[in-house]
Amino acid sequence: MRTPPLILVVDDNPANVEILQMRLAANNYDIITAMDGESGLAVARERQPDLILLDIMMPRMDGLEVCRHLKEDPSLPFMPIILVTAKAESKDVVAGLEAGGDEYLTKPLDHAALVARVKSMLRIKSLHDRVLDQSAQLELQLKTATKIQSLFWPDIPQLEEGSHIWALSVPASYVGGDLYDIIPLPDESLLVYVADVSDKGVPAALIMAALSAKIRSAARIQTDVDRLLESVNNSLHRLISEEGFFATIVIVRYWPKSGKMQFSIGGHFQPLWIVESGIGDFSQAKGVSLGISPGMHYEKKEILLSPGESILLYTDGVIEAENERNELYGYDRMVGYIKNSKGPPWGQGLTEEIGKWRGNAIANDDLTLLEIWRD
């Protein structure tokens, strides 16, 4: 809002305009005027005042029509409108407010009431503009946070011996709580994982950053996936348990040359093992989510990924994606897509399929996929 505020007075009676000018100028407001509805609408669009005093009964275009035009124009900023009229019946007041008026004054104007209404509307205008500025600053900060979070996503390495890896994470908002990482180990194996923090937005993103750092730090000392989760769980519990947060995770150690794969799970979905005949069956690895309780133990399972097979890690944003009819994408639909599609790989195509299925529905959760496959 300007300092001093700019007020537009629209009235077809020169005497009324002069009186309003004198009373408002005495309170150190800048005043501009218009003598009918059409010119008032044009001046409001051009000058975008901080407040409009608008007469209702005017030739060519009455005040209610001017009000509707201004309130329905999305390109204009918020400009509070005080409707000024001799009509004082309740139906007239209702009609004015329904047209978009923010306040109502009846003629003849009481000076004290006029000044009080003007100050009240300008306070609302000031608060509105302040909130708008804060919202713009927050959006800029969130965009910066999005860029920073994208730095956590690792480069996708080129593997040897016919092995390949691909990953994608799409936050539901500017930043999210999903996480994946690909960590090369000295023995030429890879440590990869997909994790999901039990929240969304900025808190989840901050926990995600802490979890990423703790896993990378622990991996320098411990590469057995079960014991690594035990270590990370203990340190994460000290960090987030009081706030009620936790994280689910599936972590895999993969040897590209042989296809050997070891994995452990903390409260997460089992990996999807895609074999020639469909979905492979293997015993589940048990383990609770990270951060809930210290001293937990995690199971380690092992499979051999043969040529033509794939392992798919995913978060709940995949199977819980909703379409415009509030239907969940679901596990069965995901498996059906894989069985009816050519692969490997399947991850990229599955992501596109979910996008088409969702349509114009707003994403309600972060979505992350990581796939390892062999030619």
Locations of the language-model features?
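C-terminal catalytic subdomain
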Residues: 250, 301-313, 318-375
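Receiver (REC) domain active-site loop signature in two-component systems and cognate sites
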Residues: 58, 70
